[in-house]
Design a protein with these regions (language model features):
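Active-site cores that bind ATP or allylic diphosphates and position pyrophosphate for catalysis
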Residues: 197-353, 361-364, 372, 411-420, ...
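Glycine- and acidic
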Residues: 110-117, 143-149, 301-309, 367-373, ...
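Conserved structured core elements
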Residues: 114, 119-125, 156, 160, ...
């Protein structure tokens, strides 16, 4: 939802006046806009409108005015502005990562959002730790959100496995775990709001035909039905088939966007669908499920997420979520993305691994041949080694390919740095054989537990 012109001008006026006063009444509109966006980062998506509003303010409020006039005007429109500006100056933050755009000490809230298809693996460690380390740097909140709104792809033990993995990654500091299947009524509420406002519609078109129409940038007939008809269709989605409701696959709810958008993925994308597959945490009557794009958008704003840190493969998702939130008039978080990391030579598919475990190829999720976090924990790897790996890569937009050998060389080096001063020296000889050595006198040998810490005693 784009802010009204007068509302926008009122919001940015104190910042433009302050900027003009700082430069003796002279204003560079683009520089002034930069000052505005620095303090109001939520307006970045409307930068063109902000620049136009700055130009209007310069013409109506600043041109021809003395610095004293500008100071008087600033006191008139925002008496406490200077004090608020000083109070809002961000405390310098130090940590293993570069400062995060738009983040404030004590106000940052980030999340990770795995699906319960299996435990976490190496691929999850980077993103999870990046988010967690930023939360620690800024004294903010870190949320684990389990996204389980696809009943067809749920491995029931994964709920506990994931929580256990994240507790290990965060040294037990995760206290807020949200499960999306427990929030369905919230998603339904906002789904109905979009129907009632005419911003979405229930589409019963054949999926193949609809894809052809989308490719041609043509709207289907469902789009133009009256709101009352859309409401009837929405209600019918919740009715069991035996009572006259839709069958699975009959309809989907779509957001009304630009059907001619240059990016086909942005054209009237789906928000809800019917899935009658049994869900381990929902009642048997539950059949309407939000697609990830809908539930994620709603949760990110309602849970107070300030920054969504994700891979570049989620760029379109961020744009879609922004459209949903703007139509609902809800706060939009800041989206930042890291480059794709291709872990070359890693078998990370949880579905394939699950089958292999069931067939006895692996002993379990902590089989030492796997790349799960449970395996790494069992092998003695320290969380700090993976934190150092995440910090070394950082929130970089560049794509990377990391080979099996390259990854382990880096992680093993980091792990050794951590373990080296902690590990006592022991030795072990399997199936020892006693031998006699001639020509040597007998004497006792005593070796320290650790050569650098003799106070630990001897072996």
């Amino acid at each position: 939802m784009i802010m009204a012109e007068n509302e926008l001008k009122s919001k940015i006026l104190p910042f433009v006046l302050h900027n003009a006063i700082s430069f003796s009444g002279k204003v560079n509109p683009k520089a002034s806009m930069g000052f505005v966006l620095k303090h109001l980062p939520e307006l970045r998506k409307d930068a063109k409108l902000v620049l136009a509003a700055v130009g209007g303010i310069v013409e109506s409020e600043i041109s021809g005015k003395s610095v004293d006039d500008l100071k008087a005007r600033l006191v008139e429109v925002a008496p406490d502005f200077e004090a608020q500006l000083n109070a809002s100056k961000k405390e310098e933050v130090k940590g293993p990562l570069k400062p995060l755009r738009g983040a404030e000490k004590g106000k940052l809230c980030v999340r990770i959002a795995p699906s319960p298809s299996g435990p976490l693996h190496i691929g999850h460690a980077y993103g999870s730790l990046l988010n967690f380390m930023y939360a620690q740097m800024y004294g903010g909140e870190f949320i684990l959100r389990i996204e389980d709104t696809n009943p067809s792809n749920i491995y029931s033990p994964a709920y506990d496995l994931i929580l256990d993995d994240v507790k290990w990654l965060t040294n037990g500091k995760v206290v807020n775990c949200v499960v999306q299947s427990e929030r369905l009524e919230t998603y339904y509420k906002y789904g109905r709001d979009l129907i009632d406002s005419g911003d979405s519609y229930v589409c019963d078109c054949d999926s193949d035909n609809w894809r052809e129409m989308k490719a041609k940038k043509a709207a289907c007939s469902c789009r133009d039905l009256e709101i009352v008809d859309q409401q009837t269709r929405w209600d019918k989605m919740f009715i069991p088939v035996v009572d006259g409701g839709y069958s699975e696959g009959d309809v989907v709810v779509r957001l009304k966007t630009d059907i001619a958008h240059k990016n086909p993925a942005m054209r009237d994308f789906s928000l809800f669908r019917i899935n009658d597959h049994a869900h381990p945490k929902a009642s048997g009557a539950t059949r309407v499920w939000p697609l990830m794009i809908m539930s994620v958008a709603i949760d990110d704003t309602l849970l107070g997420i300030t920054h969504v840190l994700n891979g570049k493969d989620h760029l379109d998702n961020g744009r879609k979520e922004t459209l949903i939130l703007e139509k609902l008039g809800l706060r939009v978080p800041l989206y930042q993305h890291w480059g794709r990391i291709n872990f070359e030579g890693f078998a990370l598919s949880t579905s394939k691994t699950r089958i292999a475990i069931e067939q006895g190829e692996y002993t379990g999720w902590d089989d030492i041949r796997l790349a799960t976090l449970r395996t790494l924990r069992r092998r003695g790897y320290q969380v700090g080694a993976f934190s150092k790996f995440a910090a070394a890569i950082g929130l970089s937009p560049n794509d990377k390919t990391v080979s099996w050998d390259e990854f382990w060389k880096m992680v093993n080096s980091f792990n050794k740095e951590i373990v080296e001063p902690l590990a006592n020296r022991y030795f072990f000889v399997e199936d020892p054989v006693e031998i006699n050595v001639e020509g040597m006198s007998s004497h006792d040998v005593s070796l320290a537990m650790h050569p650098d810490f003799v106070d630990r005693g001897n072996r």
